[in-house]
């Protein structure tokens, strides 16, 4: 089941105070960006946050899940989805802990 745009917009609104929040549709699901870094995936109307040590410490008792078959485990956020302040802080922590995205290589022109 693909994620509804309405759910994706709800998640983005919940974390709007975490930084510059954007999302991009990919294969019927969404990648969630904070300040240019992919911090989470939204699949099947569920939020999967990239795991980090600091994020694990912040959450405490975690629930892990897989965003799609073959994916690495992520933090599955369900109960705290309504808590804007808590969720925004988790996204800030995650974004700070992740490395900067690699610059895209320029394509060579065909002659």
Regions found by a protein language model. Name each.
Residues 1-111:
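Charge-dense, helix-prone N-terminal extensions
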């Amino acid at each position: 089941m693909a994620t509804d745009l309405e759910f994706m917009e709800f998640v983005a609104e919940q974390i709007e105070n975490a930084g510059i929040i954007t999302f991009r549709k990919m294969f019927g699901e969404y990648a969630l960006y904070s300040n240019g870094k992919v911090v989470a995936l939204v699949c099947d109307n569920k939020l999967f946050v990239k795991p980090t040590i600091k994020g694990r410490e912040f959450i405490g008792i975690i629930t892990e899940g897989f965003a799609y078959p073959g994916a690495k485990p992520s933090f599955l956020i369900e109960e705290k989805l309504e808590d804007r302040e808590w969720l925004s802080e988790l996204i800030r922590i995650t974004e700070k802990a992740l490395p900067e995205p690699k610059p895209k290589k320029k394509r060579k022109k065909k002659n």
